[in-house]
Swiss-Prot record:
Listed GO MF terms: hydrolase activity, acting on ester bonds
SUPFAM superfamilies noted in UniProt: SGNH hydrolase
Enzyme Commission number(s) of this protein: 3.1.1.-
Lineage, uppermost ranks: Eukaryota, Viridiplantae, Streptophyta, Embryophyta, Tracheophyta
Cellular component terms per the entry's GO annotation: extracellular region
Principal location: secreted
One Pfam assignment: Lipase_GDSL
Range of residues in the leader sequence: 1-23
Organism: Arabidopsis thaliana
Record has Coiled coil as a keyword: no
Glycosylation site positions: 49
UniProt-recorded name of the protein: GDSL esterase/lipase At2g19050
Length: 349
C-alpha cells in the first residue's frame, strides 16, 4: 500500500516533465489501436441500438467537442495516451472511420463490451472483444497497412469489467455465477483472452498494453448493490483478483513465447487507495459527480453535476472523471502501475 501511494505521489512530481520532453520528440508511434469497453469507448455505441450510450449532456461537459459518446465529463484514458504519444488528434471511433484511418489508428472499444459474447446482452447491441478484433482485421486488410508498420503501432486493451458487472454479478439473464466459482470464472475468461490476444499478435500487434480490471467493488454502483453499507463491496473485489492475477501471468507468458513482441500489464486495481486519491487532490471517492437516478448507472440527462469535477473519482456510478483518467493514463505512461514495461518504453522500441 505504501508503495502504491508513493508511486502516485511521484506521478504528480513527474507530470510537468512529460509535456516538455515529449514536445521535442514528435509522434512517438506511427499508429495507435484501442480495444475495450466503456472506459475506452469514444463514440462507437452512438450508432448502436443500445442503452449503453452517452451522447448527451452532461457527458462531455469538460470536453471541447461536447458529448461525443465518451463515458466521462472529459477525456478518457486513450485520449490522454494519444496526447502523450504526441498524436495531432484523438484516435477516431471505428464506426465513423474510413479504412485509410487504419494507417494512423482506430478506436474499436464499445461500452458494455466483454470477453464473453453474451456479456451485456440485456443492454442491446454491443461490440464484443471478439467482434472488435474482427473489425480490426477488416480495416487493416482493406487499408493494406504494411505488417512492418503494424509491428510498430501501440495497442491498448481494457476489457473484462463488464464480464463481472453485466454478467457474473447480474444473475438474470445470466447464469455464470451459478456455474463458476471466482477462480473458475477467471480461468474461463483468461482462456478466451489468450485466444483473442493471440489473434492480435497474428495481425501484427507487437507493442501491447493490457489493462487489468479496477476495484469494481468500490464503484458507486456496486457499493449500492453489494456494499452492505460498509464501504466497498469486498466480495466483488475478491472476485476480480484472480482475473487480474491470471491476466498478468498471461502477459508474462506472451513475453516468453513471442520474443519479437512486448506485452505489459497495467495494474489499476492495486493502485486504487482512498488515501492515495486524497493525496492526489480527490475528495469524493464513493459517489458520482453527476446526478444518477436510483437503480441507474449513467448520468441523468441535463441534471446538475458536482461543482468541482476534479475532486471526484467517479463521474457516474461506474465511470471515472477526466481527472481520474489522467492519473491512470500518466501513471501507465511513466510505468508507475505497469509490469514489466511502461507505455513510454513500449513507444521507444
Amino acid at each position: 500500500m505504501a508503495e502504491a501511494i508513493f508511486k502516485a505521489l511521484l506521478l504528480v512530481i513527474a507530470t510537468t516533465a512529460f509535456a516538455t520532453t515529449e514536445a521535442a520528440l514528435g509522434q512517438r508511434v506511427p499508429c495507435y489501436f484501442v480495444f475495450g469497453d466503456s472506459v475506452f469507448d469514444n463514440g462507437n455505441n452512438n450508432v448502436l441500438n443500445t442503452s449503453a450510450k452517452v451522447n448527451y449532456s452532461p457527458y462531455g461537459i469538460d470536453f471541447a467537442r461536447g458529448p461525443t459518446g465518451r463515458f466521462s465529463n472529459g477525456r478518457n484514458i486513450p485520449d490522454i495516451i494519444a496526447e502523450l504519444m504526441r498524436f495531432s488528434d484523438y484516435i477516431p471511433p471505428f464506426t465513423g472511420a474510413s479504412p485509410e484511418q487504419a494507417h494512423i489508428g482506430i478506436n474499436y472499444a464499445s461500452g458494455g463490451g466483454g470477453i464473453r459474447e453474451e456479456t451485456s446482452q440485456h443492454l442491446g447491441e454491443i461490440i464484443s472483444f471478439k467482434k472488435q478484433i474482427k473489425n480490426h482485421r477488416s480495416m487493416i486488410m482493406t487499408a493494406k497497412v504494411p505488417e512492418e508498420k503494424l509491428n510498430k503501432c501501440l495497442y491498448t486493451i481494457n476489457i473484462g469489467s463488464n464480464d463481472y458487472l453485466n454478467n457474473y454479478f447480474m444473475p438474470a439473464p445470466y447464469m455464470t455465477n451459478k456455474k463458476f466459482s471466482f477462480d473458475e470464472y477467471a480461468d474461463s475468461l483468461i482462456r478466451s483472452y489468450r485466444s483473442y490476444l493471440k489473434s492480435l499478435y497474428v495481425l501484427g500487434a507487437r507493442k501491447v498494453a493490457v489493462f487489468g480490471v479496477s476495484k469494481l467493488g468500490c464503484t458507486p454502483r456496486m457499493i449500492a448493490s453489494h456494499g452492505g453499507g460498509n464501504g466497498c463491496a469486498a466480495e466483488v473485489n475478491k472476485a476480480v483478483e484472480p482475473f487480474n492475477k491470471n491476466l498478468k501471468a498471461l502477459v508474462y507468458e506472451f513475453n516468453r513465447d513471442f520474443a519479437d513482441a512486448k506485452f505489459t500489464f497495467v495494474d489499476i486495481f492495486s493502485g486504487q487507495s482512498p488515501f492515495a486519491f486524497f493525496m492526489l487532490g480527490f475528495r469524493v471517492t464513493d459517489k458520482s459527480c453527476c446526478t444518477v437516478k436510483p437503480g441507474e448507472e449513467l448520468c441523468a440527462t441535463n441534471e446538475p453535476v458536482c461543482p468541482v469535477q476534479r475532486r471526484y473519482v467517479y463521474w457516474d456510478n461506474v465511470h471515472s472523471t477526466e481527472a481520474a483518467n489522467m492519473v491512470v493514463a500518466k501513471a501507465a505512461y511513466a510505468g508507475l502501475i505497469t509490469s514489466p514495461y511502461s507505455l513510454s518504453w513500449l513507444a521507444r522500441l
